[in-house]
């Protein structure tokens, strides 16, 4: 969400229509609300946890921007609070796919859709 607003690619008043799914490439990504939420802006997208809103806004922001904010928020890093056995986590994104994962390759819109709702590949 921060990546979408802070980089200026999304305005909170922008409306997205949610029919209950979003198609990216040859894949259909569903919203938890099968009937759809209809028109959603930023606040209603968050309040209703509308997957389609975040798929579309995530694609507008781009996978690189979302990954940048994952790192800014410290995701994938140790907490530094002394947890025994703690290891760093995995940051999912286009740059990480190029450098750190076994599944190196192209980044697709479907990957950004997953990333925009906090889902995606694990190493």
Question: Which residues fall in each region the model found?
Answer:
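Beta-lactam-recognizing serine transpeptidase/beta-lactamase-like catalytic domain environment
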Residues: 2-123
